[in-house]
Amino acid sequence: LLKHILQYIVFLALLCMAVCLLVSVRIRRSSIQTGIYGGQKRRGKQWGRNFMLGVQFFICWIFVTLTVSLFLQSGKVTETLFHTLSQEDKETILSIPLDYPFLENKEKQEMVERFRQHVGVKDILLSDISYTHGISGNLLMTEKGNDNSWIDINVMCVPLNFFTFMNIPITEGRTIRTKKDLVMDEVWQKRQKKDIIGMNFYDQTSDFTVCGVCAPFQTDVHNHNGGYAFTLYDSSEYIGHCYVKCYPEQQKEVMKWMETIRREVLPENISSQVRTFQDDLYEVQAVEYILKDIISFFAIVSIIITLLGVYSSITLD
């Protein structure tokens, strides 16, 4: 879609240049009296002016249509990404990066414990990576020690409270409890066309057994989603990101509290500003939002030019 939009913009720009060139040539060859009152042969038949006005309406219609389609698309994508969370949830969850090499994991844990002390904090979710910027792995084996049995699947290491925090329902079986448990989402299950509860999978160091199936987990709309596998995450080894769910009425106070803690712990050259989960999603859709703003600007300009053209036509008549 983005490629097609860019092609439309280039086409419209070339069309506008061609129209402007033709109008300029026409004006240079016409006298002022002829331009205002029309020649004897064409008086009362302002086909040229009407044609130009039609072109203006056409260009205006294209830009307005593109603007509406981009607004609808961006809204649909926002709803699709992490669709188990409501819009309010996305706006009240704070996203805090902790992947700083100069911090020991113990220091990160102490920072998280200080986060918990605020009464406005409802729950905290720890992760090894930001959910909008990657996954924990992408391969599992169906046969132990068989390098030819690797399958391509998105692997996420998640803590025990992941499914409740993200509002992801378990549709079959149960959630993860130990490091040997594995939960698959429905996307991967449908690809197998069979019951996967009890199936065994392996990586280089561990073996897993599927204990449950959850609702689809959607983190990207541009790339093919082959399904997700969820294993237990151990935050004592490494913390790369922290998500904090707040009570809506206390979100601003929680943000100030966490920004104060970050200023105390982090160096001055690192921003202490705290973002929301919705801000992370906007960053993922940055290109779409930029295009939407550009097309919206051109749509407004084309509407103004079209209205001026209609006004001038009425005035001349």
Language-model region placement:
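Alpha-helical transmembrane segments of integral membrane proteins
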Residues: 1-99
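Membrane-helix entry/capping segments
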Residues: 1-7, 41-51, 265-301
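A hydrophobic alpha-helix feature that marks transmembrane segments and, especially
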Residues: 21-24, 298-317
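Residues within membrane-spanning alpha-helices of integral membrane proteins
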Residues: 53, 57-60, 66, 154, ...
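Short amphipathic alpha-helical segments
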Residues: 90-96, 180, 238-242
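Short extracytoplasmic
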Residues: 92-112
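"Rare, low-scoring activations can occur
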Residues: 105-107, 112-123, 186-193, 203-292
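Short beta-strand boundary microenvironments
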Residues: 113-197, 206-235
